[in-house]
């Protein structure tokens, strides 16, 4: 007899050996492509080429998971396998909690991850829930099943470096070098992005295994033996005008202050360690990784205290570089906030990357549009690359990005591509991809999604919505409206998360994914979703008073009652 008594949450399994890879080809394991797609993308998130720690269900970003535990993962797989095209699966913090009758144009999956009532939205309370098996940290694309590995952030980082070069170095980073840290799931994009932007880079990472992975996947070019060796290499390559990325195993909280003491002068300074999560993402100065992980279990308060103190020293070094006239910016990991909490009162003297370099793109709905070939065949991606060039024929910068991506970026898991495009362009591309599936030019359907880091889908006062023109940085109605509109528009799955990127209490954000299966019904959904989704970004920035967004809204015919109604 099957027991009807629920198992205690704490009794579930977080570790399981073995490897998971998404199915390839056209053979369905679910009832339709509408359910096969989320199933494959869930599995793809846990592919060892994609996930940082797949045996623990961790995809990236400290403890960003794809499912709450292995029992939940198994039930999600079972539910998706049996789901009908007029049903919707509800997932609550990585746990499948219900299947409901809806309709064929409704999302097949609705996901809510890590959401806490604001007064309780702290790491301390979340970690209590997590330890009891009652919550899961979904990061952004981990719990929403649309992670594509480091490629997912390469172009955004590249665009940031290019714009910084335009603002500070007359449009060229040749002979310049970037100092940064963190080579995890997101930070691992930095060395390749710097290289593609024409700069050398020195990338500090405390785990040798992460450096090894970035070397193997060609995201970083070489590893230095120590700081002296790294600086010799940097001097040589910058003098030669070469864009070479160098990894250095060490602790940024020790190495950046040492470089300040030596009078070293990078040309740009940033950071992408997992500082948003001091318990799981930032190695304290003077500690070994083993000590750090052991004490995270036995004395978490001491770990958090030591990690934040080290972040304070790290940020003080970044401030010293800024004071010396070196362009310095936060790359969205909330390290400034952590430093301020331990007494670095001027931690926010250097800006975040969005207000400094990216916001004009967001005003036009331009952001990280990504797609994945469910066939598993790289040729499907190359054919879509060509289609993007055909349909957006006059954008040499975009064409250059696609050429560089094909040459330099290794696929992780299912073949995928990302490119930053905006309102009008996204729907055009999605409809074209759907026609390519219909005609048989592509071997299997394509899924289109994006990072939650996008123009209309996130409220994060220390990152995407920092220093908004009207002071609305912390207003989080916008990602909720984005999720609701994507649901009403017919996205295949929609997610609403809290705490991604910058940690508990500091962000709310939403995601969507839509399947191009070549049908007329898909085309109708694609036209709605891929117009409405970026349009919410234009709306949000127009509402805040940005002229670029207001002009874009008028050009695109958006009906914004308080702006142009």
From Swiss-Prot:
InterPro entries: Urocanase, Urocanase-like, Urocanase_C, Urocanase_central_sf, Urocanase_CS, Urocanase_N, Urocanase_Rossmann-like, Urocanase_sf. Residues 463-472 have a biased composition (Basic and acidic residues). The keyword NAD applies. It holds the Pfam family Urocanase_C. Its main location: cytoplasm. Binds 1 NAD(+) per subunit. Its EC number is 4.2.1.49. Catalyzes the conversion of urocanate to 4-imidazolone-5-propionate. NAD(+) binds at residues 61-62, 139, 185-187, 205, 210, 251-252, 272-276, 282-283, 331, 501. GO terms for molecular function: urocanate hydratase activity. Induction: By cold. This is Urocanate hydratase. Pathway: Amino-acid degradation; L-histidine degradation into L-glutamate; N-formimidoyl-L-glutamate from L-histidine: step 2/3. PROSITE patterns: UROCANASE. Its cofactor is NAD(+). The active site is at residue 419. Residues 453-472 are annotated as: Disordered.
């Amino acid at each position: 007899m099957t027991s009807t008594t629920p198992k205690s949450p704490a009794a579930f399994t977080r570790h399981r050996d073995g490897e998971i890879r998404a199915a390839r080809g056209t053979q369905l394991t679910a009832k339709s492509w509408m359910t096969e797609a989320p199933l494959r993308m869930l599995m793809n998130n846990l592919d060892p080429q994609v996930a940082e720690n797949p045996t623990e269900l961790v995809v990236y970003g400290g403890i960003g998971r794809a499912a709450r535990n292995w029992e939940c993962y198994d039930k999600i797989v079972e539910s998706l396998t049996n789901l009908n095209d007029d049903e919707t699966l509800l997932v609550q913090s990585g746990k499948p909690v219900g299947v409901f009758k809806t309709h064929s144009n409704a999302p097949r999956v609705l996901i809510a991850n890590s959401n806490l009532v604001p007064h309780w939205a702290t790491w301390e309370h979340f970690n209590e829930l997590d330890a009891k098996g009652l919550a899961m940290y979904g990061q952004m694309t981990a719990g929403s099943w649309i992670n594509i590995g480091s490629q997912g952030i390469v172009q955004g980082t590249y665009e940031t470096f290019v714009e910084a070069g335009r603002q500070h170095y007359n449009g060229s980073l040749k002979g310049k070098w970037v100092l940064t840290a963190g080579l995890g799931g997101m930070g691992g994009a930095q060395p390749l992005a710097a290289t593609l932007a024409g700069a050398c880079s020195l990338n500090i990472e405390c785990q040798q295994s992460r450096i090894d992975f970035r070397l193997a996947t060609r995201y970083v070019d070489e590893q230095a033996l120590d700081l002296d060796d790294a600086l010799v290499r940097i001097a040589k390559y910058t003098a030669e005008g070469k864009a070479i990325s160098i990894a250095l195993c060490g602790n940024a909280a020790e190495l950046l202050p040492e470089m300040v003491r030596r009078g070293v002068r990078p040309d740009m300074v940033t950071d992408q360690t997992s500082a948003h999560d001091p318990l799981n993402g930032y190695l304290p100065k003077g500690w070994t990784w083993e000590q750090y992980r052991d004490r995270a279990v036995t004395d978490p308060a001491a770990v958090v205290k030591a990690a934040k103190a080290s972040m304070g020293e790290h940020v003080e070094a970044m401030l010293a570089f800024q004071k010396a006239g070196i362009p310095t910016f936060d790359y969205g990991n909330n390290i400034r906030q952590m430093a301020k909490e331990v007494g670095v009162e001027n931690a926010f003297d250097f800006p975040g990357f969005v207000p400094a370099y990216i916001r004009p793109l967001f005003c036009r709905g331009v952001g990280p549009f990504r797609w994945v070939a469910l066939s598993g065949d790289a040729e499907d991606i190359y054919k879509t690359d060509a289609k993007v060039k055909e349909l957006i024929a006059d954008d040499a910068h975009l064409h250059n990005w696609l050429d560089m991506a094909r040459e330099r970026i290794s696929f992780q898991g299912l073949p995928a591509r990302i490119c930053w495009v905006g309102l009008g362009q996204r729907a055009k591309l999605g409809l074209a991809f759907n026609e390519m599936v219909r005609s048989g030019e592509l071997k299997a359907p394509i899924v289109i999604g994006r990072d939650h880091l996008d123009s209309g889908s996130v409220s994060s006062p220390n990152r995407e919505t920092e220093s908004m023109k009207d002071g609305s940085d912390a207003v989080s109605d916008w990602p909720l409206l984005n999720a609701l509109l994507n649901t009403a528009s017919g996205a295949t799955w929609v997610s609403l998360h809290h705490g991604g990127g910058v940690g508990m209490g500091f962000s709310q954000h939403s995601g969507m994914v839509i399947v191009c299966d070549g049908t007329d019904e898909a085309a109708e959904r694609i036209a709605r979703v891929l117009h409405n989704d970026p349009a919410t970004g234009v709306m949000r920035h127009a509402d805040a008073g940005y002229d670029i967004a207001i002009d874009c809204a008028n050009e695109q015919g958006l009906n914004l009652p308080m702006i142009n109604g």
